[in-house]
């Protein structure tokens, strides 16, 4: 009998996180969803999974989610780290408190969850971690200062983690969305994309699905742009 596959999705109540949960469920994963609203619990109920209302800025909330997942299914095959929105302001006007909030929202959200699932994946001798990041980490924009700064740090963290745990068959990769339809659309932004359109949350979820699959088993430590050609770096 095939082993059940289990995925945890944080910040999974709406947007790219929710769409990733739906796609992984369709792929056959049992899903456990954390969200700060009640939407994650409602979505989990719809998908036959577990929902916890809480925040990925809380070690206790994340532990409740992991413990509930292990109690129900006894394993965690995939962790998808999504995030909310951090502070935005002119670069020198961002306060210390706002920088610390950005750190919590965009980097510590991953680190906290990873600390909890890594021993479980080590015991299983397998696991994959997928972080939904941003296309602006290597070509930063003043529009998203705290996101760009801390998710650039996430890229470094991902490479170190991937190198550390590759031999134990644990992978970590980042998905780098550009302009996605979960954001308000403007003609200026649409016109900046070579493909001439916004991406969809479903396209991000499809990328997450691939990275969680056996077909991506030789991919780790990577930053995969899903941006319609927006970023110019090669």
Protein language model regions, located:
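Short, small/polar-rich loop/turn modules that mediate ligand/substrate recognition or access, typified
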Residues: 80, 166, 171, 219-221
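Substrate-binding pocket helix/loop in short-chain dehydrogenase/reductase
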Residues: 90-91, 95-103, 129, 189
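Short C-terminal tail/terminal secondary-structure segment
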Residues: 139, 209, 220-234
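Alpha-helical segment proximal to the catalytic Tyr-Lys
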Residues: 119, 163-164, 217
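Conserved glycine-rich cofactor-binding loop
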Residues: 13-14
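Active-site helix of classical SDR
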Residues: 114, 150-151, 158
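Active-site loop-to-helix junction immediately N-terminal to the catalytic Tyr of the SDR YXXXK motif
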Residues: 94, 140-148, 160, 189
